């Protein structure tokens, strides 16, 4: 697997930190008790996501093992680790994530809620609570010198509570590394998304267009606020490796799926 290495400079760090970053693994699995129909669905989706010749589960295992062998401080899992919500898939996801001791920083994507009705329901959150620090909508992990923040934007319907909690994290003043699934619209990302997904690709694959909810547009404005202590934003969803500025000096990094044979590694060093 190819590694893209990025060095991030942050003020006030007393040591070097290393994080890996992947997303969109699309694990699908059926437990025997779920029956033949569930098994057929899992097999079909696994085959669909193996278009590179690499099984999603094998690629995810390799990504986790690389982070483990490197002694990384963690691995960012920016959504769609699960292809859809089912008992079998959740069992496979848990077994996968528990296979190494490296801390996992996981946020929901659109596929983690696949099949949930109504579309804006948060009723699926309990299935992921133990994997997302008890709070899939918003979690924060404090490293002392900086903090990691994960938010669910997988349905493009940001909630008032999420933005309030993000504002509280801003007020703490520490540099933040922000994990989401759907990248926000920037000048840098529009053309790569159009090239991969067509002229209308940004409508589906990016957050921040005029037809998105006011809360979602407000969220994007918060990420572009020059006063916000955001050091960098990390995302997935577009199945494309990308790095581009949100505003000068603030990068948005998007991972390609592990099954496409690329993983990103970040080295955080003192400025």
Please report, for each region that a protein language model flagged, where it lies by residue.
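Active-site glycine-centered loops adjacent to acidic/histidine catalytic or metal-binding residues
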Residues: 24, 79-80, 109-110, 181, ...
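His/acidic metal-ligating clusters that form di-metal
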Residues: 55, 60-74, 147, 156-246
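Short, solvent-exposed loop/turn and secondary-structure capping segments
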Residues: 31-32, 117-118, 189-191
């Amino acid at each position: 697997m190819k590694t893209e290495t990025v060095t991030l400079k942050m003020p006030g760090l007393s040591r070097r930190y290393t994080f890996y970053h992947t997303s969109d693994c699309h694990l699908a699995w059926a437990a025997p008790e779920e029956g033949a129909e569930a098994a057929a669905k899992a097999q079909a989706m696994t085959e669909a996501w193996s278009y590179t010749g690499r099984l999603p589960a094998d690629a995810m295992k390799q990504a986790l093992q690389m982070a483990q062998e490197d002694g990384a401080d963690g691995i960012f899992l920016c959504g769609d680790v699960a292809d859809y919500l089912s008992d079998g898939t959740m069992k496979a996801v848990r077994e996968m994530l528990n296979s190494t001791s490296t801390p996992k920083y996981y946020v929901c994507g659109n596929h983690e809620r696949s099949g949930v009705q109504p579309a804006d329901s948060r009723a699926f959150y309990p299935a992921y609570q133990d994997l997302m620090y008890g709070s899939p909508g918003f979690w924060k992990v404090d490293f002392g010198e900086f903090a990691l923040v994960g938010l669910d934007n997988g349905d493009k319907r940001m909630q008032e509570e999420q933005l309030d909690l993000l504002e509280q994290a801003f007020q703490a003043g520490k540099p933040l590394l922000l994990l989401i699934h759907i990248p926000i619209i920037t000048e840098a990302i529009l053309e790569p998304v159009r090239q991969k997904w067509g002229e209308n690709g940004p409508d589906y694959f990016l957050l921040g267009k005029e037809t998105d909810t006011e809360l979602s547009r407000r969220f994007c404005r918060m990420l572009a606020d020059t006063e916000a202590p955001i050091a960098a934003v990390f995302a997935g969803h577009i199945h494309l490796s990308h790095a581009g500025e949100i505003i000068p000096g603030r990068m948005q990094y998007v991972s390609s799926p592990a099954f496409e044979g690329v993983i990103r590694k970040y080295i955080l060093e003192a400025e």
